[in-house]
């Protein structure tokens, strides 16, 4: 188990047991429960506990896919983000190599999707080259916990530090794509606190970190938007409409700022290529056509006939379509 697979205190053992029941029965979880409080737990604590539990589950529910045999030369994928991107990678352990493109753990990795997530698809099913993936994403991460606090051990600022320490000298930067999918918790944590997200501060830090990567010689970026989770994930059912309206506004502001800041970033860094990939169409397509994707409805979670792996995380169908659309979206700058 990697150092960021946390052992954590639980406010209620019954809460954690309920969270675990939402995970696939085939998951393997090694975790210590510490009962240190008896007061009522609010919804935010539930989703945090569930997110951690999901992040700790080894996704063996789906068989490990065969790595594409069409290897026309090695390429690198660097991923920074949160639970929607994590595979459980620890950069101080085994690094990606031919035959083991995630490094540690092996495909499909340790995900929150009940199997192969979008990162795994880019690495193993949609590639025409050998793609070595260094996925620093960690469940619960925000851009910087000094701006939006979180229980996550490693936020994106820490993840960039890990890249610098462990990986920078090992990758051919000319054949590397940097994918950043962060923001769900940057706007989500303030939502649960009934506050507006500090979007300007988040973006300032976000692009400071991108500048660190660009200064290290990385020139090819794709930045994924925050999906419309305010109106789609099961955890939002029954939430205050006032709070949801504020969250929708924060998501819109965040995604627009991403577009605006990237344009400035590219103009300030000669040779840098980059685009913002809109995640909304992929989510909308699956949610609006749930039956086509094998789901009994658009809001159930935790079983093979549901779109959602748990009440906060997208399942296999959404991840697969998103990966397919991303491959098309970045094709002008990077071919997997």
Spans of model-derived segments:
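Conserved active-site regions of diverse hydrolases
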Residues: 44-46, 53-336
């Amino acid at each position: 188990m990697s150092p960021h697979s946390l052992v954590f205190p639980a406010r209620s053992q019954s809460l954690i047991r309920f969270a675990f029941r939402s995970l696939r029965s085939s998951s393997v979880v090694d975790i210590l429960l510490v009962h240190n409080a008896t007061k009522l737990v609010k919804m935010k604590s539930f989703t945090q506990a569930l997110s951690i539990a999901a992040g700790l589950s080894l996704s063996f529910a789906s068989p490990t896919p065969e790595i594409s045999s069409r290897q026309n030369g090695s390429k690198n994928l660097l991923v920074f983000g949160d639970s929607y991107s994590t595979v459980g990678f620890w950069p101080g352990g085994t690094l990606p190599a031919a035959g083991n493109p995630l490094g540690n753990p092996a495909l499909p990795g340790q995900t929150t999707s009940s199997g192969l997530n979008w990162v795994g698809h880019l690495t193993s099913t949609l590639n025409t080259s050998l793609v070595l993936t260094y996925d620093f994403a960690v469940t619960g991460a925000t851009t910087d916990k000094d701006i939006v606090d979180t229980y996550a051990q490693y936020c994106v600022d820490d993840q960039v530090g890990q890249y610098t320490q462990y990986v920078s000298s090992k990758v051919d930067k000319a054949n590397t794509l940097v994918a950043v999918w962060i923001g769900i918790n940057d706007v989500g944590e303030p939502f649960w606190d009934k506050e507006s997200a500090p979007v300007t501060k988040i973006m300032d830090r976000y692009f400071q970190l991108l500048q660190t990567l660009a200064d290290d010689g990385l020139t090819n970026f794709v930045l994924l938007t925050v999906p419309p989770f305010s109106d789609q994930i099961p955890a939002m059912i029954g939430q205050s409409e006032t709070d949801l309206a504020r969250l929708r506004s924060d998501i819109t502001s965040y995604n627009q700022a991403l577009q605006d800041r990237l344009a400035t970033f590219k103009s300030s860094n000669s040779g840098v290529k980059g685009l913002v990939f809109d995640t909304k169409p992929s989510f909308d397509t699956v949610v609006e056509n749930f039956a086509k994707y094998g789901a009994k409805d658009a809001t159930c979670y935790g079983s093979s006939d549901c779109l959602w792996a748990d009440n906060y995380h997208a399942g296999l169908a959404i991840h697969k379509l998103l990966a397919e659309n991303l491959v098309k979206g970045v094709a002008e700058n990077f071919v997997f």
